[in-house]
């Protein structure tokens, strides 16, 4: 689908369709008023007859409106004007895209980007429109034999901005929005792929393909089990012992700043391509969704794609920690004591708390990069779902400025995160009689104790942990990966690169 931006008056548009907003109760937006004026009150007369109230999501498609050059006008309800916020704006865009796609409008000029959204500028409105459009049209049908497509799908969308002065920021918004949307799609595709296809080797192949596609700035190295053993990554290796699939750690290095003093931001993604729970096996119901336990790695991959596409002037390293947790004769057991790469020992009390055992060794491994910051992304705990539900990602950090940066980026991107505490009182729950640390700390504060566990391996750098167990995928009829937190991390890195979205 093609996107562009322009500045023009609605009466001069020759298009298959013009999209304008209507507020409750039957109040025309400024652009709709202009169209009403040139059509001699045609639109307002329809509203007076009760054809459209203006409630969020209501639509009315008009054909051959008098004196209007475009073939059709799509009126879309936006709710009460003063209550149009970020969430409602995106819902209106989503409804618009679905309506245009379902009614055979192959191209359209959208004036919704001129609506006033509280606290948001034109760059944000255009970028979110692009991201939302791509999200709305996403489908995962690679493995279906019968693929359904609209007969006349939407192919071209033009977003209007109020003045020519805003064209540059609008074009930049489209560029950024497309790159982020492509990163989200890549993450969703990886997450939705079945575990018999998407294993650690598949993740590694995707990482290598990324380096091939962006060879100017990207290098990928894949570290196998033998090299991990030599590095002392025994905790990581133990998790994969029960699987016939080799554990592989893919390291994607992007260099956008040639300065020798430029330290990288490191992103670490948990890549459990299937998590049965191991010997502490999970219930059968819903176990199919444990293919999504690699969504942290998928998100990191998507972000690295975005960074490479936009050629951001920063250095970023993404690590995909690929592994599979299966029961078997070689599987690790409750009661085992593992020696981590850091030298600390861990008593395994539950083999289904495996993500932290993989991540702790990777967090030690990345010390060699002397990072400016390290952010790990993991579907780590069911406790985080209980705490924050399916709408907000859990955030923990050992560095207040980094935590504040991430929270700010989450608000900018509409991909929200909420900070949870780390404290010595929680660390006490991880005490073990037989090792330096236990891999679980009981039910109370389970998301926090998982973060506390990881924090013991991050003392040499600024670190943040994103628990995406509640936000990485949806269950039920709309089952599928969400691509979160690609938008959050993309915004964080855009901010670091100097593109903070301010006009």
Curated annotation (Swiss-Prot):
Binds 2 manganese ions per subunit. Mn(2+) 2 binds at residues 270, 275, 293, 354. Keywords: Aminopeptidase, Cytoplasm, Hydrolase, Manganese, Metal-binding, Protease. It is found in: Cytoplasm. It is an enzyme of class 3 (hydrolase). InterPro entries: Leucine_aapep/pepB (IPR011356), Macro_dom-like (IPR043472), Peptidase_M17_C (IPR000819), Peptidase_M17_leu_NH2_pept (IPR023042), Peptidase_M17_N (IPR008283). GO terms for cellular component: cytoplasm. Presumably involved in the processing and regular turnover of intracellular proteins. Catalyzes the removal of unsubstituted N-terminal amino acids from various peptides. Belongs to the peptidase M17 family. This is Probable cytosol aminopeptidase.
